[in-house]
Design a protein with these regions (language model features):
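Metal-dependent enolase-superfamily TIM-barrel catalytic cores that perform enediolate-based chemistry
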Residues: 185-269
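His/Asp/Glu-enriched, well-ordered alpha-helical/loop segment
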Residues: 103, 248, 252, 312-315, ...
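Divalent metal-dependent hydrolysis catalytic cores, especially in the metallo-beta-lactamase
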Residues: 116-142, 155-165, 211-224, 252, ...
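Active-site gating loops and adjacent loop-to-helix segments of metal-dependent hydrolytic enzymes
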Residues: 91-113, 169-188, 222-236, 291-325
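Histidine/acidic-residue-rich catalytic or RNA/ligand-binding cores of hydrolases
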Residues: 94-97, 142, 172-173, 224-226, ...
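Metal-associated gating/positioning segment near the N- to mid-region
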Residues: 77-153, 169-172, 237, 261, ...
Length: 433
């Protein structure tokens, strides 16, 4: 690159970083008629949060307003902790034609996919989601974007990255619809493994290149044509190898599991969360509660795929309709039993930026608005291991704040229309300095 071009490029990049830094250095006082306390699940009136730099300095009606502070008064609104989505696919996107989208995603170069991923990340952040867990991304795109956001070179939510999801040959994590003559067979580096030692290697490969969490495919999925939804895709020995190795290195493990047997085997092997869980039995749900295993229900994925089933090939349409019919009953049982629940959408199956629709879907199957909000803040933060940093509005934590119009407990759909979003002290939506 020529010297003049280098200077121009650096001026753009450093200028963008400096702008963000200026936004995050001043003291800002955010006010609203009320604030949601994710510790107690109650509203506090009035809502006041004092932010200095990237951190919350003080919270609550008695918080002092420092002299010279910038004051943002949002009026009849509710302040909340920044939302957390525990299940997204940040490099994928869906529309009314899911299969067209899938093949477009497959044809992109990794560098090109990174640009799309940043665009989707910006839409997610603007929707009020200041932290996401990316559960499966090819070519290390999620790890790369996480690093760019941390460095201030890209804008987006805090990312907890899984890199490649791990599963068996021909399973949901494999590119099973493609003939071997057209697609290079995948290896443990890309997350495809067979046998305990191969699966242990797959875990090590993901961690070697930056995974914060490990994702496995324990059962079949909707968008993989050849695998039945309910059949386990990993043996007990493989599950124990994956989970044991990940835990040894301090990584949690999330299991994609629609089928009950697959989920139960994963729970018995020490899994940290079950994703989707469409066909979970009462017995498995009780076991999850007993062991403290989180359910990340991704109601959005079922809602979106069921409502778009007519546009899918017949094998996928059948599976989409099956999970739609079973998922609601499973959720009602999980809520009644008291299984720990963390908010997750599977965005990428549905469009990024629509994440907050999940709140309404959760309440439709019996969660209270308070419980749904706690699932997307305090509980999701615990599952992701970021609860010392975010998930509640408390002094010392990252200034991740969202405001929605009116009383959110009276109208949960207000979460879909944020008035104000702040991530790590920088204003993303709303009046900027």
């Amino acid at each position: 690159m020529k010297p003049k071009r280098v200077a121009w490029f650096l001026s753009i990049v450093l200028g963008a970083v400096a702008t963000t830094a200026v936004a995050a250095d001043a003291t800002t006082v955010i006010k609203a008629h009320r604030m949601f306390d994710a510790v107690s699940g109650r509203l506090v009136e009035p809502g006041v949060v004092v932010v200095t730099g990237e951190r919350i300095a003080a919270v609550g009606p008695g918080a002092a307003v420092p002299a010279g502070a910038r004051v943002v008064d949002l009026g009849d609104a509710t302040l909340l902790p920044g939302f957390i989505d525990a299940h997204v696919h940040i490099a994928d996107q869906s529309s009314e034609d899911a299969y067209r989208d899938f093949y477009q995603d497959m044809l992109r170069f990794p560098a090109e996919a990174s640009f799309y991923a940043e665009h989707y990340a910006q839409a997610t952040l603007a929707a009020g989601f200041t932290t996401v867990r990316v559960l499966g991304s090819a070519d290390w795109v999620d790890v790369s974007l996480r690093n760019a956001i941390r460095s201030g070179l890209a804008q987006g939510p805090r990312i907890v990255a899984a890199a490649h999801a791990i599963g068996s040959p021909g399973g949901h994590c494999d590119q099973s619809p493609f003939p071997p003559e057209r697609v290079k067979p995948l290896t443990p580096v890309e997350g495809v493994c067979s046998g305990p030692e191969s699966c242990r290697e797959a875990v090590r490969d993901q961690m070697k290149w930056g995974a914060d969490v490990i994702k496995i495919c324990a059962s079949g999925g909707v968008f993989s044509e050849s695998d039945p939804l309910k059949v386990p895709q990993l043996t007990t020995a493989e599950l124990e190898a994956i989970i044991g190795e990940a835990h040894r290195w301090g990584r949690k493990v999330a299991a994609h599991a629609h089928g009950d047997e697959a989920a139960r085997l994963a729970v018995e092997a020490g899994i940290d969360s079950i994703e989707h869980g469409s066909f979970l039995s009462v017995e498995t749900l009780k076991l999850m509660k007993q062991k403290g295993v989180y359910l990340v229900p991704t109601c959005m994925a079922g809602w979106w795929s069921t409502s778009h089933a007519d546009s899918y090939p017949p094998p996928i349409a059948r599976k989409a309709r099956l999970i739609g019919a079973a998922h609601d009953e499973m959720m009602r049982n999980a809520i009644r039993i008291g299984v720990p629940i963390a908010f997750g959408t599977d965005s990428g199956v549905s469009p990024h930026g629509m994440n907050a629709k999940e709140f309404s879907l959760l309440t439709e199957v019996g969660m209270s608005p308070q419980a749904a909000l706690i699932a997307a803040t305090r509980e999701a933060a615990k599952l992701l291991g970021v609860d010392a940093e975010t998930g509640t509005l408390e002094a010392g934590k990252s200034a991740d704040i969202v405001a929605v119009p009116g009383n959110v407990l009276e109208k949960i759909s207000a979460t879909e229309h944020p008035l104000f979003v702040m991530a790590r002290g920088a204003t993303v939506v709303g009046a900027r300095p």
